[in-house]
């Protein structure tokens, strides 16, 4: 049986670490009482083997085995480079 890996898209908010990036994943959640859709942001640490990401890039990341205390995601591809 093949294992399906969870993937997410997000924006790189930090690339200061070696071979690591911090990705902010935004999602829309409906407020339970008022019904308004509100943005919620989750920040995850991801593994970037070749240090190819820059600040502001849009990336796709996939879940993987724990690589460190906080890293359980790995970079799949860079979808869009930031316009600087």
From Swiss-Prot:
Q: Which GO terms describe its cellular component?
A: cytosolic small ribosomal subunit
Q: Which GO terms describe its molecular function?
A: rRNA binding; structural constituent of ribosome
In terms of InterPro entries, this protein maps to: NA-bd_OB-fold (IPR012340), Ribosomal_uS17 (IPR000266), Ribosomal_uS17_bact/chlr (IPR019984), Ribosomal_uS17_CS (IPR019979)
One GO biological process this protein is involved in is:
translation
Among Gene3D superfamilies, the record links this protein to: Nucleic acid-binding proteins (2.40.50.140)
Could you confirm whether the keyword Secreted appears in this record?
no
Keywords on this record?
Ribonucleoprotein, Ribosomal protein, RNA-binding, rRNA-binding
Query: Which family, according to UniProt?
Result: Belongs to the universal ribosomal protein uS17 family.
Q: How does it assemble?
A: Part of the 30S ribosomal subunit.
Q: Which NCBIfam families match?
A: PRK05610.1, uS17_bact
User: What the protein does?
Assistant: One of the primary rRNA binding proteins, it binds specifically to the 5'-end of 16S ribosomal RNA.
| Designated name of the protein | Small ribosomal subunit protein uS17
Origin species, per record, is: Vibrio campbellii (strain ATCC BAA-1116)
């Amino acid at each position: 049986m093949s294992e399906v890996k969870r993937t997410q898209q997000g924006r790189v908010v930090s690339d200061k670490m070696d071979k690591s990036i911090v990705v902010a994943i935004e999602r829309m959640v409906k407020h339970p009482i008022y019904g308004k859709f509100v943005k919620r942001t989750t920040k995850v640490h991801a593994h970037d083997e070749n240090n190819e990401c820059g600040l502001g890039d849009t990336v796709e990341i996939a879940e993987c085995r724990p690589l460190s205390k906080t890293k359980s995601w790995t970079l799949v591809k860079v979808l869009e480079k930031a316009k600087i």
